[in-house]
From Swiss-Prot:
Active-site residue numbers: D644 (proton acceptor)
Record gene name: CLA4
Family: Belongs to the protein kinase superfamily. STE Ser/Thr protein kinase family. STE20 subfamily.
Organism: Eremothecium gossypii (strain ATCC 10895 / CBS 109.51 / FGSC 9923 / NRRL Y-1056) (Yeast)
Domain of life according to the entry: Eukaryota
Transmembrane spans: none
GO CC annotations, alphabetized: cytoplasm
GO process annotations (BP): cellular response to starvation; intracellular signal transduction; regulation of MAPK cascade
Name of the protein in question: Serine/threonine-protein kinase CLA4
Stored InterPro entries: CRIB_dom, CRIB_dom_sf, Kinase-like_dom_sf, PAK3-like, PAK_BD, PH-like_dom_sf, PH_domain, Prot_kinase_dom
E.C. number(s) listed in UniProt: 2.7.11.1
Known function: Required for hyphal maturation and for septation.
UniProt-annotated stretches for the region Disordered: 8-27, 243-369, 383-476
Length: 793
């Protein structure tokens, strides 16, 4: 029956007898409460639900948990509960305690599997209240990760499904795992730019003057120098950059890096001519090369390179990267183009301030100093185990590793503008190129001619050396360091023993002074220094380096270097005199004073107006190189590599004596470590095997000696006017550098250079062989060096 039909059947009498109204309900019956009292429970962002509520629990169970905070290294067992609003972690399953971690489901932006641990997944949450992912560069900083590991694979998938179904920002599809991303790295001749390069590498290449032709000739070498530059400049290369390096045949790099620049180098030069000091260096740092004149090329700045090689790259996401930074980064004062290159160094040992002096001498018995040095090296140095090679087992001396000096310490002479449409010829095989020695040099010819062989490391034949991961050794405690330091120093205030004449400079770790000895310190029975070790006279001038130990990142290496220098006495090595521990934080190191200054100063002040004229005569060069070679032979006989031979580290005095200084880069070769593979030194003097990060031995010093010879001939080392990145590339690809004016040189010096600068280490001469070379027969007398020091008067 319809409603209208039912209404027609009702009459007016049906509503006359209404009856009494029902009683109202009691007050307790009305349980309605204002809605505002429950608004906080409806807010998903508010921290409610501190206690577990059985009615809200959707899934729970025991898991292992760690976050990216202070305890990121520790996995903790927690009881995890997932409800409609939160993902919560508790210490127990009782339900009575507060949550240790409570993540609103609205803030979870990503959930994905992770290889950090077995059956592990990562929950990424946004710190933004709205939960929306942050845009721009700051997006990563507003996100935090929580890593959760379950007992079984089944539990892992169950938790992933449950979390995905509850999080409003997730689409229900997890992020991909174990994926690869293939990119192509190459050079586009139409646009004149590199394709597929990481952004930071692309920026470096843009200002490095590495051209598309360089890339086509040897892409692996370009990748190698980019990888070196990137890692030593910024700490760690990006995953894409690492993959690009692997695709181009460059050796893989370990993630742990050691960076430092707060070193102090004591060069015993005449103080009156010393420029102001800057940064952490204790000698004036050579300024960057002056930028070359702009070169006009025909059509394009990049040579046409059609069909340039494209390198297939497979990138894989990196799970964990770690950078270890020692000291603060300091940039040298410079005005040239490479101002983005701070003095950095990576080595398996930590950084220290070089004391700038000699290294240990040969002894028939193991002295107490050597015995202490052996114990120090075993406990304080972090070394890589390389394949053993039988050598005479010497006393173990650990290397001392200050920061890598990527800039030389002198201003490069200005070059005239090069007219014409062609760029400077920096490729091997130029008209004046020295013959690149890949085999034994021919003694009959000895001429330095054009290259006849393909440069080592050509594309398609990468010869990367696989490196073992370094094993970290425990460092000494501060108490142990101070105990060992007290054993090799005078534990007294040296102020009454010296008169400070002049301050040479100020660095991050201390100061260098020119001083005059007033008296010999009294014998101290509590000191490990004997009275007969003091070989200086009253009234002599000395160089004193005051070091602040608290500013040294690796104090044990300072102890190691002092021990090395104490055992060094050679006529061609700057001698260590004594050391004083004034306080627990104030160390004074007294060294021999060389009034003639560095060879760099001599070269700079001997350059004439004629660019083709050598700053020094060949007899003078032969004498200086011979004296330096004698000092190197002394070190090499003790299986010690200097690793930073250059004009800055060779000092002269007014009597014509020549001495090597700055042993901050020295390394000891032992029966277990017959070769090294770390890149240290100054790039312009580096041997090709060092730039390519291959294993090397004492012959890297012979290469540097040859470069220093060219430095005395031409006023500067090869490639000094190039950007450091381009210089590294040219060293790696050209090998033996070319001479500017080979027609002006004698046959003897060209033969000498050919055996020093032989790319194949097997045929490169040793210091013993060099000392018998006919070039040294032309050496002048020491008195003839006096003309080189006239500028100091």
């Amino acid at each position: 029956m319809s409603l209208s039909a039912a209404a027609r059947e009702l009459s007016e009498s049906d509503f006359q007898d209404i009856g009494p109204a029902p009683k109202p309900p009691p007050v307790a019956y009305n349980q309605t409460k204002p809605l505002v009292n429950y608004m906080s429970q409806m807010d998903l962002g508010a921290k409610s639900g501190g206690k577990m509520r059985a009615v809200q629990r959707k899934k729970s169970g025991w898991v292992s948990y760690k976050d990216d905070g202070l305890l990121s290294f520790l996995w903790q067992k927690r009881y995890m509960v997932l409800n409609d609003n939160y993902l919560s972690l508790y210490k127990g399953d009782s339900g009575r305690e507060d949550a240790v971690v409570q993540i609103p489901l609205t803030s979870i932006v990503s959930v994905s599997r992770n290889q950090l641990k077995q059956n592990c997944f990562e929950v990424v949450r946004s710190s933004d209240r709205s939960g929306a992912p942050a845009a721009g560069a700051g997006g990563d900083s507003s996100k935090k990760s929580v890593f959760i590991a379950t007992k079984t694979e089944l539990d892992l998938h169950t938790w992933l499904d449950s979390i995905f179904s509850k999080c409003p920002l997730l689409s229900g599809v997890s992020s991909p795992t174990n994926f690869t991303h293939k990119v192509h790295v190459g050079f586009d001749p139409e646009t004149g730019s590199f394709v597929g390069m990481p952004f930071n590498w692309e920026k470096l290449l843009k200002h490095s003057r590495i051209t598309g032709e360089d890339w086509n000739n040897n892409s692996a070498a370009v990748i190698q120098v980019l990888q070196f530059y990137q890692e030593y400049n910024n700490g760690t290369a990006t995953p894409t950059a690492q993959a690009a390096a692997q695709a181009a045949g460059a050796p893989g790099r370990p993630p742990m890096l050691t960076l430092s620049s707060n070193s102090s180098q004591a060069s015993m030069q005449q103080i009156a001519s010393t420029p102001p000091y800057s940064g952490g260096e204790m000698i004036p740092q050579r300024k960057a090369p002056t930028p070359p004149k702009p070169v006009v090329t025909s059509g394009s700045a990049i040579p046409s390179a059609k069909g340039g090689p494209n390198v297939g790259v497979t990138t894989s996401p990196s799970v964990h990267h770690q950078n270890t930074q020692h000291g603060k980064q300091q940039s040298p004062t410079q005005s040239g183009p490479p101002k983005s290159l701070p003095p950095l160094h990576r080595d398996e040992e930590g950084p220290t301030a070089p004391l700038g002096n000699s290294v240990s001498s040969v002894a028939t018995k193991e002295s107490p100093t050597e015995r202490l040095l052996n114990n120090l090296s075993e406990t304080s140095l972090m070394q890589k185990q390389l394949p053993a090679k039988p050598v005479a087992p010497p006393s173990s001396v650990g290397p001392v590793a200050p920061p890598l000096r990527l800039q030389p310490q002198r201003v490069a002479p200005g070059r005239p503008a090069q007219p014409g449409p062609h760029a400077p010829d920096t490729r091997p095989g130029g008209p004046n190129a020295m013959k690149q020695q890949h085999g034994p040099p021919a003694a009959a010819s000895g001429q330095l001619g054009p290259d006849s062989k393909k440069p080592e490391g050509a594309p398609g034949h990468p010869t990367a050396v696989a490196k073992k991961k370094k094993a970290g050794r425990p460092t000494m405690s501060n108490a142990e360091i101070m105990t060992r330091l007290a054993a090799v120093t005078f534990n007294t205030d040296p102020s009454p023993f010296f008169q400070m004449i002049e301050k040479a400079g100020q660095g991050a770790s201390g100061s260098v002074y020119l001083a005059q000895r007033l008296k010999i310190p009294p014998y101290d029975e509590n000191s490990g220094v004997s009275q007969h070790e003091l070989n200086d006279n009253i009234g002599d001038k000395v160089a004193i380096k005051q070091m602040i130990l608290s500013k040294q990142p690796r104090k044990e290496l300072i102890v190691n270097e002092i021990l090395v220098m104490k055992d060094s006495q050679h006529k061609n090595i700057v001698n260590f005199l004594e050391a004083y521990l004034k306080t627990e934080d104030d160390l004074w190191v007294v060294m021999e004073y060389m009034e003639g200054g560095s060879l760099t100063d001599v070269i700079e002040n001997s350059i004439g107006s004629d660019a083709s004229e050598s700053p020094m005569t060949e007899p003078q060069i032969a004498y200086i190189v011979r004296e330096t070679c004698q000092g190197l032979k002394f070190l090499h006989d003790k299986h010690i590599i200097h690793r930073d031979i250059k004009s800055d580290n060779v000092l002269l005095d007014t009597h014509g004596r020549v001495k090597i200084t700055d042993f901050g880069f020295c390394a000891k070769l032992t029966d277990k470590r017959s070769k090294r593979a770390t890149m240290v030194g100054t790039p312009y003097w580096m041997a090709p095997e060092v730039v390519k990060q291959r294993e090397y031995d004492e012959k890297v010093d012979v290469w540097s000696l040859g470069i220093m010879t060219i430095e005395m001939l031409e006023g500067e080392p090869p490639y000094l006017n190039e950007e450091p990145l381009k210089a590294l590339y040219l060293i790696a690809t050209n090998g033996t550098p070319k001479l500017k004016h080979p027609e002006l040189l004698s046959l003897e010096i060209k033969r000498f250079l050919s055996v020093c600068l032989c790319v194949d280490v097997r045929y490169r001469a040793s210091t013993e062989e060099l000392l018998h070379h006919s070039f040294f027969e032309t050496s002048c007398e020491p008195e003839e060096l006096a003309n080189l020091l006239k500028w100091k008067k």
